Amino acid sequence: RCYLLSRQYHYPYWEANSLQAISEHLQNDDDRHRLTADNLQEIDFVNVDQMPDSLLSGNLAQRALTLFEAYGDVYQTSGAWRTLSTSYRNIGDYNSAYACLTNALEKDTAINAAPDLVASIREQMSIVCSAMGDKQRSDYNRNIYLDLQERTRQDRQLEARAEQLSFSLRQLDFMIVAVIVLIA
């Protein structure tokens, strides 16, 4: 429904999001067979290039990527590269999967401001390198992923602590005002 409405009313951002979400749901063989059987007419509608079922996920991910690039959303574009990479990985094309992940990291370095996104890309790079039998690159990417996860966890802990301190400060301010009012 979201895809249909976004196409009808020319909302490329939502069209791309819809295509990417459908692509992600079609990546698992069992899910793809069930979704295709249950939604044949809808699948035929989004399958404008008449791709075989096994390649439809990649086609939809590529179309989402093209739309996100045209829209100019760096973070969504990186996510679309990651989705396309997973589609390639699922059909055994590990070199293309790795190239997609490299593009996700290198096309626009602004994504480095989103460590969770970079961490998920590095995690996928580690998986792809492992599938290619490249232990050294797999370990390298896994270590970056783990470092980013640890840093992100520490950042969240610090943010939670700062919020607690801010709350305590507001309580103390209130108590000081109450004491001053009682004294006066």
Where are these regions (language model features)?
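Alpha-helix N-cap/helix-start positions at coil->helix boundaries
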Residues: P12-Y13, V74
